[in-house]
UniProtKB/Swiss-Prot annotation:
Pfam families: HrcA. This is Heat-inducible transcription repressor HrcA. InterPro entries: GAF-like_dom_sf, HrcA, HrcA_C, WH-like_DNA-bd_sf, WH_DNA-bd_sf, WHTH_transcript_rep_HrcA_IDD. Belongs to the HrcA family. One of its GO terms (biological process) is negative regulation of DNA-templated transcription. It comes from Parasynechococcus marenigrum (strain WH8102). Negative regulator of class I heat shock genes (grpE-dnaK-dnaJ and groELS operons). Prevents heat-shock induction of these operons.
Length: 324
């Protein structure tokens, strides 16, 4: 694409700022008056026409002014993003007051997500660092009446347990199913396809225990500010909102991209169709050698990108410092 002239850059930046603030299309006269562009309305109108021809601005109604297109937002983010305001310094001061106790990492992530949402007005997500999966070392089953205590022991030393009701007839199989799982784990993992038919009832109980959420080592991510996202005018349509809520409810980790670089996904750039009416701003953070987590903000394409970009970068950097 041919580079924009200085005047076109100024007009595009002003149009984005106006629309983010007001959600109203804007005309040339308003841009001149509000943003002090040193040119006549006719000159600014000509620049807006050129930007529209290049697909950077669009006119929602024949008699209306212009608003940014997804391509216009992309050009703005890549080339015209201003320095964040002094308000970001206030966020940094808040972050310095948050410290990490290893027993309360989830609490820390919740606090950071809440501060991100309060600061930006956007929905925030923070994923935990993707850590290597622990190897299951042993399964122990303890019966007490019609209850069964299932205990899992990992090679890391971590243990978890679940107390559940034992179905009729399954108690006779417990010794055999425990012996079978020991043999399976000696080979590295459990191959359920090799489960003997006579152990099917106890096997079903054990599989349901292994799949129970309480047996997961940790929450994979925290989400805050969903109500802020739902309240945005862009999502008042049920057709836009339903697939977005379903994605966040069923596959929240799919909202962020697995990357070790900061990024901004605008509209149809996002691989998830449910998010193609949104923008996602994210930055990675690291936890030693254990993996990469993501700090992300989700909102309409009409968002304050400079503030969002600066906020996720600072929270990610704060987590880097705390975890390393």
């Amino acid at each position: 694409m041919k580079p924009l002239s200085a005047r076109q850059q100024q007009v595009l930046q002003a149009t984005v700022h106006h629309y983010v603030d007001t959600m109203e299309p804007v005309g040339s006269r308003t841009l001149v008056q509000r943003f002090g562009i040193p040119a006549s309305s006719a000159t600014v109108r000509s620049a807006m026409g050129a930007l529209e021809k290049r697909g950077l601005l669009t006119q929602p109604h024949t008699s209306a002014g212009r608003i940014p297109s997804a391509l216009g937002y992309r050009c703005y983010v890549d080339d015209l993003l201003p320095e964040p305001g002094v308000a970001v310094q206030h966020l940094e001061r808040e972050l310095t007051g948050l410290s990490l106790r290893w027993a309360a990492l989830d609490d820390l992530l919740q606090q950071l997500a809440r501060r991100l949402t309060d600061f930006t007005g956007l929905m925030s997500l923070i994923t935990r660092p993707q850590q290597p999966r622990a190897q299951l070392e042993a399964i122990r089953l303890v019966q007490s009446g019609d209850r069964l205590l299932v205990m899992l022991v990992e090679d890391s030393g971590r243990a978890s347990h679940l107390n559940l009701r034992l179905p009729p007839g399954a108690s006779d199989e417990l010794t055999a199913i425990e012996r079978w799982t020991d043999q399976q784990l000696e080979d590295g993992s459990i191959n359920w396809r090799s489960l003997p038919p006579q152990l099917q009832r106890s096997g079903d109980v054990l599989r349901s225990a292994l799949d129970h959420p309480s047996m997961s080592p940790e929450t994979p991510l925290v989400v805050h500010g969903l109500s802020r996202l739902v309240a945005e005018p862009e999502f008042h349509s049920t057709a836009e909102l339903r697939p977005l809520l379903e994605l966040i409810d069923d596959q929240p980790c799919a909202v962020v991209s697995a990357t070790d670089q900061p990024g901004v996904w605008i509209g149809e750039e996002h691989p998830q169709k449910a998010l193609q009416a949104c923008s996602v701003v994210q930055a990675p953070y690291r936890c030693g050698q254990e993996g990469v987590g993501q700090v992300a903000l989700v909102g309409p394409m009409r968002m304050a990108y400079a503030t969002a970009h600066a906020a996720v970068q600072r929270v990610a950097r704060h987590l880097d410092l705390l975890l390393n």
